[in-house]
Design a protein with these regions (language model features):
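A short, glycine/Asx- and small/polar-enriched loop/turn
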Residues: 113-114, 165-172
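Glycine-rich loop(s) and the adjacent beta-strand/alpha-helix scaffold that form part
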Residues: 148, 157, 161-165, 174-202
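Conserved redox-cofactor binding core of oxidoreductases
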Residues: 14-19, 28-159
Length: 202
């Protein structure tokens, strides 16, 4: 599902926020079936810390190598059924656990943006959180970008090509299609950051 609106998929994703591990980064190399990743977990760890701190990710640190701990806010509460199941699992198994998902939802304090506050547990998530508790571009990064005075918001635009300069060996801009007029525009910038939904862009 593509989001043809300001905020895109940041308004409709499930907010589950997990770190990749070296199990993920080394799988191609160990299995010998594909190209090895050029990075490892240690390269991304400080950026995971930064993003989790900025957007507000709640969750529980559990000390599992395949499920890396992070810079989490207090976890959301389990419901009564989940709580009972968690107790049953811990009684019967010493090598298994049940934990709440790690979600980009503020459970304590506030985060930068347009009046973001904590989750009120009112089940309004699917209509867009009126409290700004769950992370979205509209409640966090767009207001922050607007405050810089250097942002131009251009809705109704689909990036169809990243402009690559072979001499500089870097992206120098994007080519977009206006969804209303079908005109093509180019935007140049020293830095290009892509934020996209993987299935729609693969």
């Amino acid at each position: 599902m593509r989001g043809y609106h300001v905020g895109g998929r940041s308004l409709t994703w499930g907010r589950q926020s997990y770190r990749l591990t070296d199990f993920d980064f080394e799988a191609n190399w160990k299995d010998g079936i594909a190209v090895d990743w050029p990075i490892r977990y240690k390269d991304l760890a400080p950026w995971y810390d930064y993003v989790e701190g900025y957007i507000g990710v709640s969750g529980q640190n559990v000390g599992l190598p395949q499920f890396p701990d992070g810079n989490y806010l207090k976890p959301m509460e389990l419901n009564c059924v989940e709580d009972h199941l968690q107790g049953s699992i811990s009684e019967k198994y010493n090598d298994r656990l049940l934990t709440i998902g790690r979600t980009a939802i503020i459970t304590e304090g506030t985060k930068p943006g347009l009046g973001r506050s904590t989750c009120q547990y009112r089940s309004r998530c699917m209509r867009g959180c009126p409290f700004g508790a769950y992370f979205s571009s509209n409640s966090s990064t767009l207001p922050a970008a607007e405050k810089t005075g250097n942002m131009t918001l251009r809705p109704n635009s689909i990036v169809n090509e990243v402009i690559y300069d072979a001499d500089q060996k870097r992206a120098t801009g994007v080519r977009v299609i206006d969804t209303e007029t079908k005109e093509v525009y180019e935007f140049k910038n020293p830095g290009v950051a892509l934020s996209m939904f993987n299935l729609d862009n693969s």
